[in-house]
């Protein structure tokens, strides 16, 4: 039976998964629209303006529904995760506020000018508007991923003994968090791949049916060039992201790789394995020697810690965390004797582990060896979902690289419409970016468990005092509403894609010159 924590996690996870069906396409499409319109302004060829307007209509559908699905996410921090909001709100809220004030308003203002400014702006002004929408979309992703990156690697903050919550000490450390920076570029690049694949798939559909040949060939060419560069960048930055994870989240990396034991350097990479959580081992594993050590440490002599070793390392932190937790209870009840405060300051870095232990030890004054053992096992995520979601992401990314390279070669040869198998391959590859992105998001968030904020706040302690009935009702409502949004997206996209660019010829604007 699911409890409040499970239902809260499911609600946020499903909300984010639905929302992230729309976000990557927004990031990718708007950048491609800016490129198409730039070609129009530079060359004066109106076909590129027509392409911008046609793909822009599909972008508008996706943008509107993406905004709608994102609204409830920020509210859930207050409704479902109130302790989280109180405990780290001063830090976590800063990048979200910057996103709203700087990025979202910029994006929202200029997206209206993009759609309704064709007859009111000259082509140079409209091009500037399009690039500003693209800049705003990417800036929005930057601030949101700064917030998420801080959850993975909390820098520039400390526990304030007066307010009994986390406070920011350095805004620059939050902004330039190395995990955030790598996550931002990796995620945005994945969005570019999504936009490119979307345009290529629909263009391939037109070419297979002998429709909209001029627009489809040019769109496919732009998509294949842009998409190839983007998928190469995505895979390269994925390697950088994994390296950062190895440095700051070794438990997540070990779960991603099904690494139970610390093996001699350089560690092998498990291509496939069957992790068994209860036995703390893999039932079987197919390995590539040395590859994991090279990827995770960029060396041949550094070991990759295994989950058993990492669990053992949590024991002293749980002990110190227990003492910090007990001292915090004294301080919160008014005991601020200098020796108490001094003792707490020496232990506050492990307070999160005390919160984690409290889930397994109702009486923190008397913690048994079995309770410590349960907390140690609870300090790692379920390995199989993390292990397989990582491989789904990498597998889809590798297939996308192959598709993009084949499409690019045939495009450069000028024979793309002569090879129907390439067009069919592009069409049937349309779901791959979304599968990769959703699997990657799941791996990133689920692999951080049991932490809401890595090593600082367990998910167990972050929730609100709601009932299961309240959460079940709101979960059903959100899933139902978001499913309707998704159906609307698919219907409208299919409708206007089937109509094609030629259906818009009668409504072409006369753009101001100058």
Swiss-Prot record:
Its EC number is 7.1.1.3. Pathway: Energy metabolism; oxidative phosphorylation. It comes from the Bacteria. The chain crosses the membrane at residues 23-42, 95-114, 130-149, 188-207, 220-239, 393-412, 471-490. Its cofactor is heme. Induction: Induced when bacterial cultures reach stationary phase; synthesis is triggered by phosphate starvation or a shift from aerobic to anaerobic conditions. Residues 1-22, 115-129, 208-219, 413-470 are cytoplasmic. It is found in: Cell inner membrane. May bind up to 3 heme groups per complex. GO terms for biological process: aerobic electron transport chain. It holds the Pfam family Cyt_bd_oxida_I. GO terms for cellular component: cytochrome complex; membrane; plasma membrane. The N-terminus is blocked. A terminal oxidase that catalyzes quinol-dependent, Na(+)-independent oxygen uptake. Prefers menadiol over other quinols although ubiquinol was not tested. Generates a proton motive force using protons and electrons from opposite sides of the membrane to generate H(2)O, transferring 1 proton/electron. Belongs to the cytochrome ubiquinol oxidase subunit 1 family. This is Cytochrome bd-II ubiquinol oxidase subunit 1. The gene is appC.
């Amino acid at each position: 039976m699911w409890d409040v924590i499970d239902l809260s996690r499911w609600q946020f996870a499903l909300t984010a998964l639905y929302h992230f069906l729309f976000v990557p396409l927004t990031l990718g499409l708007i950048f491609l629209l800016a490129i198409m319109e730039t070609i129009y302004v530079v060359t004066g060829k109106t076909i590129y303006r027509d392409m911008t307007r046609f793909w822009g209509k599909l972008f508008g559908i996706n943008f509107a529904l993406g905004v709608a699905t994102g609204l409830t996410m920020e509210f859930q921090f207050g409704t479902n995760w109130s302790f989280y909001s109180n405990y780290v709100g001063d830090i976590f809220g800063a990048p979200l506020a910057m996103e709203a004030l700087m990025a979202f308003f910029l994006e929202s203002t200029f997206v209206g000018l993009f759609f309704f400014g064709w007859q009111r702006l000259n082509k140079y002004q409209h091009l500037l508007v399009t690039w500003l929408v693209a800049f705003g979309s990417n800036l929005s992703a930057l601030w949101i991923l700064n917030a998420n990156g801080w959850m993975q690697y909390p820098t520039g903050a400390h526990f304030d003994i007066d307010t009994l919550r986390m406070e920011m000490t350095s805004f620059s450390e939050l902004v330039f968090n190395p995990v955030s920076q790598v996550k931002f570029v990796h995620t945005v690049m994945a969005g570019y791949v999504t936009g490119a694949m979307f345009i290529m798939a629909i263009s391939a559909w037109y070419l297979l049916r002998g429709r909209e040949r001029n627009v489809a060939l040019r769109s496919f060419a732009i998509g294949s060039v842009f998409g190839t560069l983007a998928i190469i960048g995505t895979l390269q930055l994925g390697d950088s992201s994994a390296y950062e994870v190895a440095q700051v989240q070794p438990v997540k990396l070990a779960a991603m790789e099904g690494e139970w034991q610390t093996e001699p350097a350089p560690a092998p990479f498990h291509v496939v394995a069957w992790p068994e959580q209860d036995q703390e081992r893999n039932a079987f594993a197919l390995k590539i020697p040395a590859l994991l050590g090279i990827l995770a440490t960029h060396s041949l002599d550094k070991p990759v810690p295994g989950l058993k070793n990492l669990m053992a390392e949590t024991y002293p932190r749980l002990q110190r965390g227990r003492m910090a937790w007990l001292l915090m209870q004294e301080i919160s009840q008014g005991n601020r004797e200098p020796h108490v405060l001094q003792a707490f300051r020496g232990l506050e870095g492990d307070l999160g582990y005390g919160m984690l232990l409290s889930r397994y030890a109702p009486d923190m004054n008397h913690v048994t060896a079995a309770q410590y053992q349960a907390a140690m096992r609870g300090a790692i995520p379920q390995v199989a979902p993390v292990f397989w979601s990582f491989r789904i992401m990498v597998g889809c990314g590798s297939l996308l690289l192959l598709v993009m390279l084949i499409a690019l070669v045939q495009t450069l040869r000028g024979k793309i419409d002569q090879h129907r198998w390439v067009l069919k391959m592009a069409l049937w590859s349309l779901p791959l970016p979304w599968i990769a992105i959703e699997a990657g998001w799941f791996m990133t968030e689920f692999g951080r468990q049991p932490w809401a904020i890595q090593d600082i706040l367990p998910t167990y302690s972050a929730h609100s005092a709601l009932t299961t009935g309240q959460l079940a009702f709101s979960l059903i409502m959100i899933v139902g509403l978001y499913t309707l949004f998704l159906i609307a997206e698919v219907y409208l996209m299919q409708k206007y894609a089937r109509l094609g660019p030629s259906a818009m010829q009668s409504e072409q604007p006369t753009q101001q010159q100058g």
